[in-house]
């Protein structure tokens, strides 16, 4: 049996995909989840907090398992695969199409919980790759921040460059950018 919080998040995902963030209400989510609005508010103080938790859940769910720290190619491949999975998320497509100002807030004004979690995960993986001698020296947190920016930009801006980058080209160029940023040996 699904617990109430999971049912609410699942219902919120369906409502956002169907109607967008701005048109999704607590009543709609509660109705779809089969719970009272009070149950929703026991878990989250407001719909905005609930929707932030939803986005975090969906993004964290695509984080990949660890790769051997001595294999930069495996790390780059898994970063590109993860970026592609995020790029293809129906939730992200819906937000980009119906609520671009919300996305802009997390690109131009502040980082969200999921971005902080992804950064921390990247920093740990980069530190392990540095210890194995395959990632260049430097502050792992700073390298992770730039890696996050590169991948985030590639994911969010991909629809703008389809004229020049097909799917294979997008993957190839993102991999080259990430490898060039992280590589300790200067391979390009």
Sequence positions of predicted segments:
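Generic hydrophobic, amphipathic alpha-helix propensity
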Residues: 1-12, 29, 54-58, 62, ...
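Helix-turn-helix
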Residues: 7, 11, 15-49, 53
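Short amphipathic alpha-helical elements of helix-turn-helix/winged-helix folds
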Residues: 11-15, 85, 150
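Hydrophobic alpha-helical connector segments
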Residues: 53, 64-92, 144-147, 171
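Amphipathic alpha-helical packing segments from all-alpha helical-bundle domains
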Residues: 63, 104-132, 141-145
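Amphipathic alpha-helical segments used for helix-helix packing
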Residues: 87-109
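Hydrophobic/aromatic-rich alpha-helical bundle segments in the mid-to-C-terminal region
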Residues: 94-95, 101, 131-177, 188
């Amino acid at each position: 049996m699904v617990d109430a919080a999971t049912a609410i998040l699942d219902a919120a995902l369906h409502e956002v995909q169907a109607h967008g963030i701005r048109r999704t209400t607590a009543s709609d989510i509660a109705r779809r989840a089969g719970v009272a609005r009070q149950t929703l508010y026991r878990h989250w103080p407001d719909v905005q907090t609930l929707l932030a938790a939803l986005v975090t859940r969906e993004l964290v769910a695509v984080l990949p398992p660890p790769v051997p720290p001595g294999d930069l190619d495996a790390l780059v491949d898994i970063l590109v695969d993860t970026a592609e999975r995020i790029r293809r998320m129906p939730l992200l497509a819906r937000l980009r199409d119906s609520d671009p100002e919300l996305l802009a807030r997390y690109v131009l004004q502040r980082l969200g919980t999921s971005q902080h979690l992804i950064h921390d995960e990247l920093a740990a993986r980069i530190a392990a790759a540095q210890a194995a001698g395959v990632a260049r020296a430097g502050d792992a947190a700073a390298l992770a921040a730039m890696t996050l920016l590169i991948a985030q930009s590639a994911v969010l801006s991909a629809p703008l460059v389809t004229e020049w980058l097909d799917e294979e080209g997008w993957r190839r160029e993102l991999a080259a950018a990430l490898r060039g940023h992280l590589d300790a040996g200067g391979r390009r």
